[in-house]
Amino acid sequence: MPYYMNIAIGASCFNNGQEDATAASAAVATNPRPYRRDIHTAILPTSPTATSSRAELNALVLALETALERKAGLQFRPRFHLFVKSCSSYVVGIMTEWKAKWQMNGWKDAKGNVIANKDLIERAVQLEEAVTRGGGGFVAYQLVPRKWNGYVNWVARKALQWETKGQ
């Protein structure tokens, strides 16, 4: 019997791409039986410059780390099926379409430039491979409307507000 895990990811960024930008990521894992909601947040470092794209990718890394922890804690090692929901077409596109091409091209785009956010993308790919290692499992990515991702984006925004008020 497979183990199913659902994680919604989201992010918030103030002053996106500016020198003084701050960003936060969130991953909210839910399981129906027993009902459980695990909330994970992270504030992005200021270097490299925080952007909404980096925050969304960092949310994916949080989600995959959460899944890996959960998988390691399972008693019988069932097939592990992870469903990641995101309102970021950038993140979903990377993990479903572009990563294979970029890997073959040495993490370069069609023009020969090193892809943006390579560090986070490589980390996400490594974590995805770790989650599916052992056979029988998979990670699926679903692009959802922003309004469906309201809670997780709110969590990221609140984490960022909390962080910026504390400084």
Residue spans of the language-model regions?
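RNase H-like nuclease fold core
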Residues: M1-A55, T66-A72, A159-G166
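RNase H catalytic domain
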Residues: N16, L60, L64-L160
